[in-house]
């Protein structure tokens, strides 16, 4: 009985992973749902922007993200993947000075990690099957520099409450762009 149940679960997991990796529509649906959940969690983190206006900074998000051109599905998926990896790295930093509910931060990290894994599954399979080069993709160097500026800002401000409030708003803005990129994941 137990072996039969385990076999069914294993088959279901294999099927769902394969089905996910084959369908950008499903990926887009899951991505939109997860993006919404991440935005909701970010809004739950306290921090009043009006008290931190003196700490505002233009992190200069790459033009390729602000002015979305026609992205191929794979390009959009890879860009979202890179953005989520960097968001994950940012929220793994010391946020103890914020007074944020750690459960909310942990849920945010878990949600972002889950999205990263879904995208990784799709990207690995597509990269194996299709021959597309990183030359076609938006420069990930611009993204790395952008997120580097955010991390440098947090460090320079000694991970203060206001610095985190500014970064939280910037990451909310990131999810707006991720939502737009998610639109390119349709089959």
Curated annotation (Swiss-Prot):
GO cellular component: extracellular region; extracellular space
Pfam families: Interferon
Phosphoprotein among keywords: yes
Any GO BP annotation: B cell activation involved in immune response
Secretion signal span: 1-21
Phosphotyrosine modified-residue sites: 24
Broad class of the protein's primary localization: secreted
Disulfide bonds, paired cysteine numbers: 52-162
PROSITE patterns to which the protein is assigned, alphabetical: INTERFERON_A_B_D
This protein's UniProt keywords: Antiviral defense, Cytokine, Disulfide bond, Glycoprotein, Pharmaceutical, Phosphoprotein, Secreted, Signal
Record's function text: Type I interferon cytokine that plays a key role in the innate immune response to infection, developing tumors and other inflammatory stimuli. Signals via binding to high-affinity (IFNAR2) and low-affinity (IFNAR1) heterodimeric receptor, activating the canonical Jak-STAT signaling pathway resulting in transcriptional activation or repression of interferon-regulated genes that encode the effectors of the interferon response, such as antiviral proteins, regulators of cell proliferation and differentiation, and immunoregulatory proteins.
Assembly description: Monomer.
Family note: Belongs to the alpha/beta interferon family.
Name of the protein in its database record: Interferon beta
UniProt gene name: IFNB1
